[in-house]
């Protein structure tokens, strides 16, 4: 008895006094559960019913205090009483002192264990816990509560040995249950430690572990195994997670493997998951790899032939980019050739970039050459030849042309030609006027002849009035104009100039008679002068 050995020694006290105290307290002590009123320990048919009633009964606090005080006084006599005596006194003392040998009696009676253990607890409550009701202690010592406590404590020990690398919802639920059990047990543990309750009732009240209890104790282990399987199925196979991001369900970290081998990150051990910026779930190049090595490792990777560090498109050198703001690329997303192929597969026609054409306006019209094609140019010359001569500086300017005219006018043949041309013009005017006056002169002569008294002559004159008059007048006028016309025809180049200048073009004014006398050269100069005038006037 651990509780009895811990109590102080009462051997110096008179045994008679102790016996008297026990006899007085026999009436106040409660009747032990599952026993008859006559003190016999044989159970009757109503043993189970009485045990339930005793369990439900709530003892008074004054009885608890009285029993506790008298139990200390009677503790010394418990060891001196022989357990094998057959007298009636010994039987009554054994009935009164059930607290001393409850372990020997309860081993044969499993139905009495709960009540006796509860009485032991209530009888051994110290004076410091008088306000605590005994009902709580009886519930605490119930075998069902003790079994649950053992299950939770064993589960707590198992969960402590279990690794916390991959906790799951199942583990968290079990841990929460263990924590609550620990809190409730810790709240009541001071009552057990501070009290003088013997440990043997606890062991006696708890039955030996059976197969069912072992299965219940081992049930947290089975739950942890299931949680381990769940955590293994959800955790990635690689030892690190890029930026702490978890891939979407169903994708996992085998994204680059399921891409049909198009392109993967060249970093050794990287499966293409995550991104350097944290904005994407995967990457395909070193620029977005969160596990990107330093420059020396990249250079070593470049020496390896199986490492992809540039665009994998056939015929692509890595130059250019789809966006246009970059000069190179290393992946299919920026390859312009792959982009064109993708658009071709979709059936989208891309228009090639065209160079900007200049806007049609005044500047272009100013740059266009003028249309200087002239009709009626001298023989052997064309508009292209005139333009070439003008660009080469062979065509004289207007001032040069004026000087040339003055120089030609000072010479004698030019002056005589001008005078003859003037006289010719005057003679032509006189010929026209004389031809108009001829009919009037003929009429006057006819009138004069009619007044003559010779009648035979008049009919002859009337018969041919116009013939004799027209005959002498026409040859007279022809004779007067013949010398000038012959002189003009005999002049060198005059006839050719007349043939060419007889039908001038409509938009150009007629040539002056002075310009017509210079021959082919004068005609060329005249045409050049006219072109310059047209350019100045804007024709």
Curated annotation (Swiss-Prot):
InterPro entries: Znf_C2H2C, Znf_C2H2C_sf
Zinc finger (CCHHC-type): 256-299, 302-345
GO biological process, one term: positive regulation of transdifferentiation
Comp. bias regions, Low complexity: 40-49, 181-198, 205-215
Chain positions covered by the region annotation Disordered: 24-117, 181-218, 453-485
GO molecular function: zinc ion binding
Protein family (similarity comment): Belongs to the MYT1 family.
Phenotypic effect of disruption: Knockout in the rectal epithelial Y cell results in impaired formation of the PDA motor neuron. Knockout in Pn lineages (the precursor cells of the ventral epidermis of newly hatched animals) results in the defective formation of ventral cord motor neurons.
Compositionally biased intervals (Basic and acidic residues): 60-69
Function summary: Transcriptional repressor which promotes neuronal differentiation during embryonic and postembryonic neurogenesis. Together with components of the MuvB corepressor complex, negatively regulates the expression of non-neuronal genes during neurogenesis. Required for the generation of postembryonic neurons from epidermal cells.
Keywords: Metal-binding, Neurogenesis, Nucleus, Repeat, Repressor, Transcription, Transcription regulation, Zinc, Zinc-finger
Location, primary (coarse class): nucleus
Key word Transcription regulation present: yes
Biased composition (Polar residues): 97-117
Binding site for Zn(2+) 1: 265, 270, 283, 289
Gene3D superfamilies: 4.10.320.30
Protein's UniProt name: Zinc finger protein ztf-11
Subunit organization: Interacts with MuvB corepressor complex components lin-9, lin-52 and rba-1; the interaction is required to suppress the activation of non-neuronal genes in neurons. Interacts with sin-3; the interaction is weak.
Compartments (UniProt record): Nucleus
GO CC, any one term: nucleus
Superkingdom per UniProt: Eukaryota
Annotated Zn(2+) 2 binding sites: 311, 316, 329, 335
Organism the protein comes from: Caenorhabditis elegans
